[in-house]
């Protein structure tokens, strides 16, 4: 992907409200020329997010065009994933300036007659990251075929937008540095943008969510010993738990990594849904997985972006005491505690597989 992205995040560029923009800036900063948000114009990505260096925030498309982009990236994923009406004219203007459009919205821009005709006339492409394949099927438990050759790790969380994708990408990079055979299965539009492939499971017909997760997991396992599946939502989320359960049942993880934010006590935008204490939540999560597979939570990834260094370290120590599990913030600190927990779990599994195979051969 040789895109030079101008990212549209008008009125929303921030640590929590511009997930797609933030991931693109964190993992492919060399492809970002600027971010459009008139409310933060003059700032840099570093000032807004704490990373991204001197990528500028500009006030308008016209100002961004001066930096020679060749693509416009929709940098937010609002609740419901619909295109803000106020952005329509800007996107058409971008197409008129021969920018490709990359979108992770539920609104499929390529199916919109006006956008499609304008893009066709200008000779540019529209990439809808959330558009699912047409040939999806139901899940059939086929991930069990991996039991003797790969370990599947799913990130789960106490809420949405809490670090499930970022944790897996941090772990993937750290594992590759150690020479481990690992792959990342993207299940959301932002992960697809970063990784270059995947299926946005929240855009899939309900009957096929687990089937999409199954397909992704099997595909990711072709050249990997460890498959890191990007989690979505939360089992207690009143809006998105259906996706969470479909992903859990389709990917059939062997183990899970719990993602949490120490300062978050209720589901975002649903303050009436309180988040249980973490040890209790972990028990709930393991019981949710148990009918199809016993899958323990083996580590905790914390999102401490809103805490000072001392507070973050104290939160990690507290979680380790309360859960008796390794914990860290894999972005702020070293992800090694989680990497080592996964590696130990994987080795223990396959010591057991080899022992069973040896016993079976002896019995014959």
Model-identified regions with their sequence ranges:
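Short, hinge-like loop/turn segments at secondary-structure boundaries
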Residues: 50-54, 114-124, 144-147, 199-204, ...
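Conserved catalytic-core segment of NTP-binding enzymes
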Residues: 107-109, 113-116, 120, 128-129, ...
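N-terminal leader/targeting and accessory segments in enzymes
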Residues: 2-121
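C-terminal lobe/tail of nucleotide-utilizing enzymes
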Residues: 5-8, 12-13, 31, 43-62, ...
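Flexible, glycine/proline-enriched loop segments at strand-loop-helix junctions
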Residues: 102-106, 154-162, 199-204
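ATP-dependent carboxylate-amine ligase catalytic core
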Residues: 3-4, 10-12, 18, 26-27, ...
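Walker A (P-loop) phosphate-binding motif
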Residues: 140-182
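Structural motif
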Residues: 6-8, 73-75, 154, 226-228, ...
């Amino acid at each position: 992907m040789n895109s030079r992205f101008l990212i549209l995040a008008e009125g929303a560029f921030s640590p929590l409200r511009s997930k797609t923009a933030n991931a693109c800036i964190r993992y492919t900063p060399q492809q970002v020329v600027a971010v459009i948000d008139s409310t933060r114009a003059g700032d840099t990505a570093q000032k807004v997010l704490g990373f991204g260096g001197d990528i500028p925030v500009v006030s308008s498309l016209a100002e961004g065009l001066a930096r020679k982009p060749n693509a416009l990236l929709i940098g937010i994923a609002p609740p419901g994933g619909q295109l803000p009406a106020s952005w329509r004219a800007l996107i058409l203007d971008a197409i008129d300036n021969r920018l490709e459009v990359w979108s992770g919205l539920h609104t499929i821009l390529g199916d919109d007659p006006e956008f499609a005709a304008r893009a066709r006339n200008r000779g540019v492409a529209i990439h809808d990251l959330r558009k699912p394949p047409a040939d999806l099927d139901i899940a059939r438990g086929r991930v069990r075929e991996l039991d003797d050759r790969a370990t599947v790790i799913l990130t789960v969380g106490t809420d949405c937008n809490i670090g499930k994708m970022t944790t897996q990408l941090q772990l993937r990079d750290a594992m590759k540095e150690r020479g481990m055979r690992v792959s990342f299965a993207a299940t959301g539009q932002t992960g697809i943008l970063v990784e270059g492939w995947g299926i946005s499971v929240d855009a899939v017909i309900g009957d096929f969510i687990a089937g999409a997760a199954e397909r992704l997991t099997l595909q990711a396992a072709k050249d990997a010993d460890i498959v890191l599946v990007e989690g979505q939502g939360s089992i207690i989320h009143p809006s998105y738990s259906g996706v969470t359960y479909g992903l859990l049942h389709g990917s059939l993880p062997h183990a899970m990594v719990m993602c949490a934010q120490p300062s978050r006590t209720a589901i975002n935008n649903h303050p009436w849904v309180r988040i249980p204490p973490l040890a209790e939540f972990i028990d709930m999560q393991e019981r949710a997985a148990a009918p199809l597979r016993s899958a323990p939570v083996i580590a905790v990834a914390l999102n401490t972006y809103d805490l000072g260094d001392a507070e973050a370290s104290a939160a990690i120590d507290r979680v380790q005491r309360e859960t008796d599990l390794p914990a860290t913030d894999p972005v702020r600190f070293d992800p090694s505690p989680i990497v080592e927990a996964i590696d130990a779990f994987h080795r223990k599994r396959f010591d057991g597989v080899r022992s069973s195979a040896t016993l079976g051969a002896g019995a014959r």
